[in-house]
Structure formats: structure tokens, C-alpha cells
């Protein structure tokens, strides 16, 4: 059958269910439209059904509203609701009236993840109801004067706000072309007109498939020009207002000036309301278009970040939510973040924390979280006083998680760790730790606590009362490696807090076995290794918990993961401070095992440094010193490592070799010779080269070359030494013994005692002021001062 035979169209509307809107004060009316095409004889040719819905917004509904009257009015005005449903409407309205505004946490999260659509506003709300069939009339209005253009655009906007109409509007190229032209030509003539037309295109921008249409008409670029213009206008308004305010302040008795100022201020307020409606819809359109990163880059090149940061000075919550949401999206790219830094964004955001508007506070915290990945911006956050403000939010379940993440990032910087001691942060965190019912504590919470425990002042607060006891109890109960890592950080600080651990040495030592999880054992070992307490009987601990076989077994290459082996080495270094422990370890054959491990891990500076430190501890004790010097090749390894590129390794080597040299003359000579050779290597090479030049006739023989450099002991060659007047006479008037009165460290004369044998001894029989255990990748020693450069 041909199309022209279809002469008649029959439309039937059938009412359906009525529901309440999930988040707004509104009713949703469901209805069904059945369209049937009738033939010439009235018989149906083609039919289609479509389910639709209408939203009835009830702006005036509040606690004092007369529900019965409002229900009657709704039924009378909405033809889709049958009068028989009056009681149902009344019940729904009663429910809306009494429904709490606060949503559940999950709903809030979903709701705040995207700003709300712009509401109806002046110029958009007209009495006339738009009809899709009257589009030609509305298009004609766009060719008339400004008031008619505003009316025409408002009617088209009514249609565009219903997503069901968008596809039909998309096909109407005449309408879209006219709207784009009017916006381009007349946006400066009327804010209402510009707002209406941008809102129409915003409706299209809510759906990704229509973004090509907006790009085609270059609406995005036009919106950016409009936003830039409006922001500059706002600055001019503020300047004018400021001048008039200043005039009033200078002459408070002048009523004419005061009235003029009040009139200007009232006008300014009206203009700002309309302007913010325009800014909001234009920015929302751009935010939707920014789904495409290429489009976002174009916006960035047109200074979108500067515009958005300027808009942060506004007071309109809905506009601010949109602006901050946009900035949050942009902040994930470094270039945009750098633009935000230039505009001092942190200073502008700090005024929003805290604020009454939950959604704004939530999205602002999320933006700050993105920005807090930048070290300079974290510094700025502390400078502007965000630390106590964020700490105060830890008590609010809605913001606790995000605030904690920002604070965690701030706590990563050692400069700011101590500042947490002057806030209410630590008591709140301890409360959260102890109230946590799960076996594993939230990762954000425990990570934050681990960072804070790296600072001595914070640790004093953590250990107040039964703090440490409660932490130990929980860590041992649940075998939590992260909580034990926090305890390990606590244990590294010298002073009263370290002595608290004496009560838990047995509990910790009992965890050192192959039966426990390796991660947990690593942290327990690390905690024990930090306990450099003179009164602690390490020999008793090693024997009672049978730790020596465990430690020796783990030293075998490949016996365990490197992290665990390293902790074992550090633990051996700690217990080796005790004379009886060092002897116990030497008897067990741990020293050869350490040398074997040193060979296997010679490329790993951290392993090398910690193993050398064990040797350093052991050479203080007679039993282990003799084993190291006479039965192992440890001194030879130390000589090889004397000039390692790692400063920490060199330092430990020097100190260890100095002690070996004091107790063994043969090694003393080798060590001193090597130090001299290294320190003067450049000069020795030059002398050797000169001697070679003078002795070219002996080039193929060793007679003249041998005595100079290659074979003899350098310290037996006084003819190569300098004195204050130049080279010492070659006849050897000064004996090498002259140099035995000086302590050479890396070749530098540092004193007139050979080696530090006369230094005072501490509780372990060690010289006072000797070097401490070298830092590991785990962290710095607690008593090591920090020096930081404060960048601009």
C-alpha cells in the first residue's frame, strides 16, 4: 500500500502510574502514547506505542503546604492524571513533604559525582506550552526583534529539555542553523537569549552522539568567548561598585552618594544572578564536550583553566560545584595543574573548607586530592592553613575518607610530619584504629598512621596511655603486617618510647619462624632490630627463641626473599653489639655465611653496607675480632670496598678498617698503604710517567722500572713524598715511621693518634661517638637531622 493512502492519524494517550522523584520535590507521571495511521476507509494501517513520562516539579512544597489543595491543583492542571487518582496524588505529596533531604552515603556519592542540570530560570519559564508541531512558528520568531527571539528560544528550549524530542530537533537543520546564527550575532544584546540558546545546545551535549552537531556549529568556541567576556564584565562591575563604596566611606553623611551606591549594588546583584545562570549553562556544555580529550586540549589552549579559577570567587553554590567539578577533571593533566598553580588555586579553594553545601565540600576535597600529588601544592596547602581544617573533617563520615587521603599525601613530606602533633589528628586516628572491627584496617588509615609514626613527636602522642599496648595486641592477634610496620616505625625513635618495647621483645621474637607470613616476620624482625637498648639481654632472647639457626639459615643465598634476608642481616648487626651475642654468632658460623652472602649480593649497595656494619660491630669484641681478622677474608673485602662510590659504604669501611688496623700490624700496613696509594694515585701516575720518559732506553727491561712503583711498598718510598718545601730529599732522610704518628682517613691527616683506641666506651664496650647503623631504604635513622630546601 502506498504512503499517500494513509490519510488519517489517530493519537491516543493513556495515563499510567504516578511516582515520586528520587531526589527532587517532584512527581513523575508515566503515560503511554499510541499513534495509529488510518487508511481511507478508516481501517488501521500502521500503529506504534511509546512510553513517556512527565515531571511535575513542586517548587512551593514545604512543611506548611496544604497537601489537599495542592493535590487538587495538580490533578486539575495535569490532564494525564485521572480525577480518580486524587487520593493517590495526595498520599505521594504527603510522602514528599515528609521525606528527609539527606540521602544515603551511596546515593550522595552518585549524586555528587556530577553537577545537577541547570534549573529553569527567568526567560525560560513562560506560560505558553511548546508543541513540537509548531516548530516553524518558533523558528520565525528567531528572525524578529530581541523579545520575540527570547520567546522563540524559550519555547524551543522547552522542547529540547525533553530528551524524546532531541532526535527530531536534530533533523531540523533550519532551526539549529538559526539558533547558532542568533547566538553568534546577538549574544551581547540579551543575556536571556544567550542563556536560552546555549541551554538548547547543552541539552544536546548531554548525549555523546550529538557532540558532532555542537562542534559543527562551533558552539564550544563561542561559549568560551562568551564566558571570557562575561568574566571581564564582572570585573568592571566590581570596579565601579568599589569606587562608589569608597566614595561613601569617605563621605558617610552624603545621602546622595549612599543612595547611588545602594541603587548600583541592587542592579549589580540582579546582573550577577543572570550572568551566573549564563555562566553555569555555558560551562556545563563545555564540561560535557570535554569528554573528548582533544576538545579539552583546545579549551586548555584558550585558557579555560584561568577562566574557571577566576570563577571560584563567586558565591553561587551551584556554579561553584560546576566550576570545581570541571577543574577536578582538568587537574589530572600536568599542564592544566601548572596553570592552576599560576592562578594560586589553593588560596581560592581554602575558603570552601569547610562550607555548608555538602556537594561543594565533597568535590572541593576531591580536587585538592588530585592537586596534593604535587609537592609544591602540598607545601602551599600547609602554608594556607589547610592542615587543621582537614583534620577537623576526619570526624565526619561523609568526608573522612577523602580528607584522610589528602592528609596522607601531606604526611609523605618529612617537613610536615611534626605539624600533625599540633592538631587533633592523632587521637582521632588512634580512635579509628581501635574501633575498626575488620581484621585488616583500611589501607588509607594505616598508611597515614605509618607515615606519622616516622616522627618522634607524633610517636609520643601515639604511645600515650596504653597506645602501644593496644597496637601490639591488635597486630599480634590479626598478624597484620601493615600495623606491625607502624609499630616498627615507632620503635626506631630513641628515648622513652623505645624503652616501652622491652615488655614486647618476647612476643616479637616468638613471631620469628617459618610458620608465619613472610611480610609479618619482616616487620617483626625490623622492630627487634631497632631495639638498641643497653639493658636488653639479647643472648637470652636468641637462645630462648632459638633464633640463631633461623638467622643462619636465611643467610644462605636463595633461601628467602631479599627483603627478609636484609632484615636478618640488620638484626644480626643489632645483636652483635652485645659481646656474648657476637661470640655466640661467631661460633655458629654466621661470619662465613655473611661473606658468602656479600659475594652473592655485591651489586646491591644496601646489602653490602649492612653486612659491613655487622663486621664493624663484631670487630669490637675479642672473640669475633680474631675470627674476622685471622680466619676470614673480610679485611680484604673491606679494603676493596674502601673506595666504593657509595658514601655510606666508604664510611663504614673506614671505621671498620681503622679498628682492624689497631689490633693487627700486618693489616695496618696494608690498609695504610692502600689509603696512601688511593689518595695520591694521580700524583703517583704522574711520577711513574715521568720516570718512564727519562728511562726510555730501559723500555724493554724491568731493571729501572721495578723499584719505583710496581713492586715495592709505597710507604717505603720516601723519595716520592712531599714536605712543606717541596719534594723530600731522595736519600730518604725522613723515615716512613714519621707517618705512623698520624691517623690517615682516606689519606687525610686527621690526628696524632694512630687509631681510636683511646676513645671512651659506651654500655656495649664501644667507643662513644662511633657511627650509627647505616640507613636502609626503609627509612632514615630517627636521630639523623633532616635538612630541606624550601623552594618558592
UniProtKB/Swiss-Prot annotation:
Region described as Disordered: spans on this chain: 103-124
Biased composition (Basic and acidic residues): 103-119
Entries under Pfam families matching the protein: KAP
Keyword terms: Phosphoprotein, Repeat
Gene3D superfamilies (alphabetical): Leucine-rich Repeat Variant
GO molecular function: intraciliary transport particle B binding; kinesin binding; protein phosphatase binding
InterPro entries, alphabetized: ARM-like (IPR011989), ARM-type_fold (IPR016024), Armadillo (IPR000225), KAP3 (IPR008658)
Highest taxon of the lineage: Eukaryota
Cited function: Involved in tethering the chromosomes to the spindle pole and in chromosome movement. Binds to the tail domain of the KIF3A/KIF3B heterodimer to form a heterotrimeric KIF3 complex and may regulate the membrane binding of this complex.
Subunit structure: Heterotrimer of KIFAP3, KIF3A and KIF3B. Interacts with RAP1GDS1/SMG GDS. Interacts with SMC3 subunit of the cohesin complex.
PANTHER family in the cross-refs: KINESIN-ASSOCIATED PROTEIN 3, KINESIN-ASSOCIATED PROTEINS
Protein name: Kinesin-associated protein 3
Amino acid at each position: 500500500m502506498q504512503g499517500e493512502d494513509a490519510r488519517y492519524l489517530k493519537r491516543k494517550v493513556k495515563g499510567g502510574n504516578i511516582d515520586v522523584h528520587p531526589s527532587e520535590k517532584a512527581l513523575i507521571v508515566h503515560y503511554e502514547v499510541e499513534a495509529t495511521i488510518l487508511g481511507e476507509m478508516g481501517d488501521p494501517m500502521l500503529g506504534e506505542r511509546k512510553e513517556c513520562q512527565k515531571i511535575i516539579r513542586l517548587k512551593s512544597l514545604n512543611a506548611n503546604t496544604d497537601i489537599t489543595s495542592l493535590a487538587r491543583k495538580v490533578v486539575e492542571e495535569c490532564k494525564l492524571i485521572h480525577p480518580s487518582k486524587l487520593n493517590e496524588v495526595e498520599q505521594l505529596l504527603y510522602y514528599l513533604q515528609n521525606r528527609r533531604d539527606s540521602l544515603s552515603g551511596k546515593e550522595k556519592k552518585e549524586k555528587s559525582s556530577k553537577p545537577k542540570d541547570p534549573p529553569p530560570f527567568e526567560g525560560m519559564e513562560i506560560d505558553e506550552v511548546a508543541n513540537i508541531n509548531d516548530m516553524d512558528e518558533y523558528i520565525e520568531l528567531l528572525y524578529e526583534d530581541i523579545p520575540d527571539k527570547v520567546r522563540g528560544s524559550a519555547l524551543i528550549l522547552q522542547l529540547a529539555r525533553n530528551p524524546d524530542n532531541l532526535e527530531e530537533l536534530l533533523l531540523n537543520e533550519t532551526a539549529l542553523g538559526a539558533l547558532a546564527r542568533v547566538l553568534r550575532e546577538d549574544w551581547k544584546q540579551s543575556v536571556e537569549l544567550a542563556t536560552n540558546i546555549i541551554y538548547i545546545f547543552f541539552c544536546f551535549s548531554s548525549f555523546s552522539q550529538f557532540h558532532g552537531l555542537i562542534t559543527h556549529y562551533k558552539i564550544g568556541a563561542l561559549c568560551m568567548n562568551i564566558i571570557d567576556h562575561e568574566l571581564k564584565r564582572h570585573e568592571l562591575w566590581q570596579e565601579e561598585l568599589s569606587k562608589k563604596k569608597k566614595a561613601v566611606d569617605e563621605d558617610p553623611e552624603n545621602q546622595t552618594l549612599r543612595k547611588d551606591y545602594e541603587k548600583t549594588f541592587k542592579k549589580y546583584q540582579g546582573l550577577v544572578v543572570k550572568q551566573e545562570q549564563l555562566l553555569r549553562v555555558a560551562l556545563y556544555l563545555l564540561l560535557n564536550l570535554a569528554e573528548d580529550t582533544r576538545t579539552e586540549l583546545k579549551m586548555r589552549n584558550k585558557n579555560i583553566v584561568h577562566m574557571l579559577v577566576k570563577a571560584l570567587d563567586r558565591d553561587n553554590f551551584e556554579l561553584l560545584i560546576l566550576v570545581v567539578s570541571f577543574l577536578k577533571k582538568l587537574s589530572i593533566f600536568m599542564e592544566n595543574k601548572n596553570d592552576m598553580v599560576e592562578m594560586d588555586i589553593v588560596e581560592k579553594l581554602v575558603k570552601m573548607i569547610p562550607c555548608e553545601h555538602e556537594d561543594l565540600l565533597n568535590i572541593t576535597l576531591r580536587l585538592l586530592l588530585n592537586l596534593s600529588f604535587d609537592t609544591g601544592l602540598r607545601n602551599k596547602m600547609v602554608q594556607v592553613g589547610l592542615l587543621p581544617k582537614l583534620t577537623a573533617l576526619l570526624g565526619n563520615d561523609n568526608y573522612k575518607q577523602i580528607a584522610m587521603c589528602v592528609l596522607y599525601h601531606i604526611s609523605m613530606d618529612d617537613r610536615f610530619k611534626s605539624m600533625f602533633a599540633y592538631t587533633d589528628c592523632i587521637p582521632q586516628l588512634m580512635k579509628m584504629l581501635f574501633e575498626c572491627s575488620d581484621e585488616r584496617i583500611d589501607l588509607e588509615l594505616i598508611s597515614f598512621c605509618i607515615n606519622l609514626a616516622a616522627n618522634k613527636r607524633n610517636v609520643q602522642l601515639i604511645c600515650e596511655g596504653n597506645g602501644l599496648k593496644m597496637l601490639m595486641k591488635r597486630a599480634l592477634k590479626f598478624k597484620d603486617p601493615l600495623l606491625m610496620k607502624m609499630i616498627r616505625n615507632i620503635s626506631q625513635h630513641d628515648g622513652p618510647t623505645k624503652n616501652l618495647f622491652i615488655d614486647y621483645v618476647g612476643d616479637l621474637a616468638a613471631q620469628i619462624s617459618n610458620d608465619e607470613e613472610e611480610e609479618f616476620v619482616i616487620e617483626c624482625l625490623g622492630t627487634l632490630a631497632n631495639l638498641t637498648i643497653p639493658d636488653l639481654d639479647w643472648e637470652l632472647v636468641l637462645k630462648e627463641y632459638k633464633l640463631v639457626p633461623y638467622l643462619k639459615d636465611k643467610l644462605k643465598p636463595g633461601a628467602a626473599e631479599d627483603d627478609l634476608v636484609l632484615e636478618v642481616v640488620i638484626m644480626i648487626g643489632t645483636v652483635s653489639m652485645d659481646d656474648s651475642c657476637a661470640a655466640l654468632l661467631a661460633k655458629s658460623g654466621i661470619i662465613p655465611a655473611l661473606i658468602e652472602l656479600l659475594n652473592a649480593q655485591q651489586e646491591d649497595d644496601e646489602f653490602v653496607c649492612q653486612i659491613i656494619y655487622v663486621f664493624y660491630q663484631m670487630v669490637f669484641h675479642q672473640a669475633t675480632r680474631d675470627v674476622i681478622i685471622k680466619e676470614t677474608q673480610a679485611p680484604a673485602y673491606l679494603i676493596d670496598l674502601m673506595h666504593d662510590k657509595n658514601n655510606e659504604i666508604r664510611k663504614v669501611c673506614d671505621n671498620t678498617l681503622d679498628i682492624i688496623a689497631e689490633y693487627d700490624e700486618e693489616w695496618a700496613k696494608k690498609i695504610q698503604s692502600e689509603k696512601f696509594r688511593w689518595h695520591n694515585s694521580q700524583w703517583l701516575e704522574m711520577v711513574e710517567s715521568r720516570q718512564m720518559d727519562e728511562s726510555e732506553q730501559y723500555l724493554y727491561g724491568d731493571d729501572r722500572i721495578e723499584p719505583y712503583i710496581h713492586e715495592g711498598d709505597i710507604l717505603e718510598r720516601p723519595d716520592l713524598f712531599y714536605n712543606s718545601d717541596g719534594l723530600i730529599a731522595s736519600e730518604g732522610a725522613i723515615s716512613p715511621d714519621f707517618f705512623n704518628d698520624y691517623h690517615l682517613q682516606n689519606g687525610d691527616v686527621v690526628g696524632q693518634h694512630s687509631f681510636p683506641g683511646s676513645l671512651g666506651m659506651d654500655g656495649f664496650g664501644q667507643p662513644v661517638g662511633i657511627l650509627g647503623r647505616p640507613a636502609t631504604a626503609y627509612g632514615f635513622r630517627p636521630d639523623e637531622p633532616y635538612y630541606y630546601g624550601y623552594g618558592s
